UniProtKB/Swiss-Prot annotation:
Residues 621-689 form the S1 motif domain. Its cofactor is Mg(2+). Residues 552-611 form the KH domain. Gene3D superfamilies: GHMP Kinase, N-terminal domain, K Homology domain, type 1, Nucleic acid-binding proteins. This is Polyribonucleotide nucleotidyltransferase. Its main location: cytoplasm. Belongs to the polyribonucleotide nucleotidyltransferase family. Keywords: Cytoplasm, Magnesium, Metal-binding, Nucleotidyltransferase, RNA-binding, Transferase. It catalyses: RNA(n+1) + phosphate = RNA(n) + a ribonucleoside 5'-diphosphate.
Length: 706
């Protein structure tokens, strides 16, 4: 049955069509917002996947180039691997809905959001996030939503829901919030040093709109929703669970209290092994390994959370707001342009900066208008960082997401192209990880950029906050380690300067958090961030005054846009000759700005001089050393600048009469000439005799008398 539902959001109508497209999916809907259209499908397998202890949810956000009226580039001319934006949007869709499936649900669930049409004023990511919630809510998949999502901007002190393209350009906040009616589930933000109070206000502002949208989704589900499937979960024998807990609880509790990670893991593993062996000897083949592993995992989680909530201690013996020991180093790698090593507890990140020509920027050819990215951050998480072995492959979604978060944190502090005309790439290599590696890469990036001499507007640091919540008992944790992330209820990453926040990412494993927890977490993160910044300043507190000797030297000049073709030359002949002769890189912008990247200052200045000569307009009185390129019976044509020539009339060759031009000059001769006239067509008249002394003229120029 085909139905259309409509609701106005931020002055534009959201239209939801159900029952027309993709009717074999468990749940399907077409959303139209402005001229943006996204088709979202949700499907689930008929039975649980065997032998897994996680929920197999996959989310794919498909960018179709036809949605923007484009044909894909490349030889194949069809969509290939998902873009970085598509991967980040897939993660945005995934994160708020994942906690809202029943515990123990092991059926494969797949969400596919296909962008069919794009309106730059109505971003398709938010539409896809809403569509995923609607598709799940109307399906028979056991989803405990709905959720809703909005984009929030801050323009001239005013908060805006789902800002337009122009408003986003002028916004000091780029915030995405997802939540249920009761609480916030997910936050993703980039900002230009907004305060904690402003950020909290924006999040709560978003949640009010989310509540309205959820009421709309509930109406849709009530009218066209299917009956939900029954969830098949593993049943635990209560008597057996009591027996296992009595044997293993004390052993696991003692193991958890081991401060060092590897030793703690070994003791937990030993406690589990002893428990399994004990019950295997008792029950032999009747022992259900799946049940005992599930019970042991629940004991580990409960004992860890009890330690934090009621003993007010953490597994590594820290206080709730205590940050692990920090060390910072710079200038570790002699041939790189800048490097920084940030170590926090057992998490260690080495960040390396490379400075390049403006032409090295990354071109982002997506569904919106073509853009470029001058500052790039790439995050690598090799298996050895957690003491494991694994095949090395291209970066996964997690690595791309963490890299984008650290990039967003630093981007507002990167100097403008006018102030620092370089493309900047930072690579963060995670050498060891026990939690908060993405925020360690924020700190490492700051250290390495300052070491490279990049004039950051301010230093940026990041911290990962955690949460453990049971009823009214709440513990907010600063600088969480891996175990606290895995067994806790929240991963709340906050990065910023001493003045304010530049990036936030929050994921919740429970059904949301309320305003008091958000407020306390933001304030505790601010205190921690300031502490980390002070530690970083002990290693380096300002950019180095000089760039690395191995970094390219950048020179900048401005020419009239009409002169660009002269610098490039026919088929690029002129510019390629300059590059070949000097070894520089040259980038020319449409407004006539030219950037020259050279390995040495001398090479850059030579290229600059050549370009100056190309675009220089001769004026009356200018003196040049020119080259004779053509002889005529009435005079000689002399090249005075690259691509520019003038005529020395035979009467201006010498003070004495010259019968034949060939008597005085030959093609290829280099002579000094003076500009004596420029006519209305721009033709240049030159004089040689104006620069010759009369006394010596005959001796120098009359071959018959010489």
């Amino acid at each position: 049955m085909f139905k259309v539902f409509k609701k106005e959001i931020a002055g534009r109508v959201l239209e939801v069509e159900v029952g027309k497209l993709a009717q074999l999916s468990n749940g399907s809907c077409l959303l139209k917002y402005g001229q943006t259209a996204v088709l979202v499908n949700a499907c689930a397998s008929k039975s649980p996947r065997e032998g897994i202890d996680f929920f197999p949810l996959s989310v794919d956000y498909e960018e179709k180039m036809y949605a923007a009226g484009k044909i894909p580039g490349g030889f194949i001319k069809r969509e290939g691997r998902p873009s970085e934006n598509a991967i980040l949007t897939s993660r945005l869709i995934d994160r708020p809905i994942r906690p809202l499936f029943p515990d123990g649900y092991r059926n494969d669930v797949q969400i596919i959001a296909t962008v069919l049409s794009v309106d730059i004023d109505c971003t398709p990511d938010i539409v896809a996030m809403l569509g995923s919630s609607i598709a799940l809510s109307i399906s028979d998949i056991p989803f405990q939503g709905p959720t809703a999502s909005v984009h929030v901007g801050l323009v001239d002190g005013k908060l805006l829901i789902n800002p337009t393209s122009d408003e986003r350009e002028h916004s000091s906040l780029d915030l995405v919030v997802s939540g249920t009616k009761d609480a916030v589930m997910m936050i993703e933000a980039g900002a230009n040093e907004v305060t904690e109070a402003q950020m909290l206000e924006a999040i709560l502002f978003a949640h009010e709109e989310i509540k309205n949208i959820i009421s709309f989704i509930e109406e849709i589900a009530a009218e066209v929703g299917k009956e939900k499937q029954e969830v098949v979960t593993l049943e635990i024998n209560e008597d057996f669970e009591t027996e296992v807990r009595a044997y293993a609880k004390t052993r696991i509790s003692e193991a958890i209290r081991t401060v060092e990670k590897l030793e703690r893991n070994a003791k937990i593993e030993l406690a589990n092994e002893e428990t399994i062996n004990y019950f295997y000897e008792k029950y032999q083949e009747e022992l259900n390994l799946k049940q005992i592993h599930t019970i042991l995992d629940s004991i580990l989680k409960e004992e860890t959370r009890n330690l934090i909530l009621y003993d007010k201690k953490r597994p590594d013996d820290r206080q709730h707001d205590e940050i692990r020991p920090i060390s910072c180093e710079v200038d570790l790698l002699p041939k790189t342009h800048g490097s920084g090593l940030f170590t926090r507890g057992q998490t260690q990140v080495l960040s390396i900066v490379t400075l390049g020509a403006i032409g090295d920027v990354q071109i982002l050819d997506g569904l919106g208008k073509e853009e470029s990215k001058r500052y790039m951050h790439h995050y690598n998480f090799p298996p050895y960082s957690v003491g494991e072995t694994k095949m090395l492959r291209s970066p996964g979604r997690r690595e791309i997401g963490h890299g984008a978060l650290a990039e967003r944190a630093l981007e507002p502090m990167i100097p403008s192209q006018d102030d620092f005309p370089y493309a900047i790439r930072v690579v963060s290599e995670v050498l060891a990880s026990n939690g908060s590696s993405s925020q360690a890469s924020v700190c490492g990036s700051t250290l390495s950029l300052l070491d490279a001499g990049v004039p950051l507007k301010d230093m940026v640091a990041g911290i990962a906050m955690g949460l453990v919540k049971e009823g009214d008992a709440v513990a907010i944790l600063s600088d969480i380690q891996g175990m606290e992330d895995h067994l806790g209820d929240m991963d709340f990453k906050v990065a910023g300067t001493a003045k304010g926040i530049t990036a936030i990412q929050m994921d919740i494993k429970i059904k949301g958090i309320d305003e008091p927890i958000l407020k306390d977490a933001l304030e505790q993160a601010r205190v921690g961030r300031l502490y980390i910044l002070d530690k970083m300043k002990e290693a380096i507190s300002s950019p180095r005054p000089e760039l690395s000797p191995y970094a390219p030297r950048m020179l900048k000049m401005k020419i009239h846009p009409d002169k660009i073709r002269e610098v490039i030359g026919s088929g690029g002949k002129t510019i390629n000759k300059i590059i070949e002769d000097t070894g520089v890189k040259i980038d020319i912008e449409n407004d006539g700005t030219i950037f020259i990247a050279a390995q040495t200052q001398e090479a850059g200045e030579l290229a600059l001089s050549i370009i100056n000569n190309i675009v220089r307009e001769p004026e009356i009185g200018d003196i040049f050393k020119g080259k004779v390129i053509k002889l005529m019976n009435f005079g000689a044509f002399v090249e005075i600048l690259p691509g520019k020539e003038g005529l020395v009339h035979i009467s201006n060759l010498a003070h004495e009469r010259v019968n034949k031009v060939e008597d005085v000059l030959a093609v290829g001769d280099e002579i000094d000439v003076k500009v004596i006239e420029i006519d209305q067509q721009g033709k240049v008249s030159l004089s040689r005799k104006a620069l010759l002394p009369k006394d010596n003229d005959k001796k120098q120029d009359d071959p018959q008398k010489a």
